[in-house]
Amino acid sequence: MSASIEKALSEKAGVAGSALLRFTLGVMYLTHSIVLKVFTFGFAGTAGYFASLGLPSATAYLVIAAEAVGGALLLANVATRWVALALLPVLGGALWVHAGNGWVFSANGGGWEYPLFLIVASVVVALQAFAVRASSADRAPAIA
């Protein structure tokens, strides 16, 4: 395979991989917010859970809104780097909540590996968006 074809395929694979990660992260945030917190537990149930952790009940509504809006913006490819970074405190809170449960997701209350993975994925999405922005000053970035 020629070097130019290999380079073109490599660039396309990188863009496709970035878009796939961004899209998947957006779907995760949306479903975690709407399906889990709103439809499964309900607003009152989610607020009650937050209160049981010693957090103000209103925090639940902020987290639901942040995950729903952030997920939609990631799916729409709007302000990707800033959205991915802005959602890190939400994931940090989730990591804090699950930290005492152990590593495995099947642990009572869920493990902390999933929030940690999502933190890393969000940082990668933000870094990729910054990299695309920096490498394409003369055109609108595909995943900015």
Per-range role (PLM):
Residues M1-V38, A58-A65, V69, L75-A144:
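Extended, low-polarity transmembrane helix blocks
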Residues V38-L53:
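Membrane-interface interhelical connector segments
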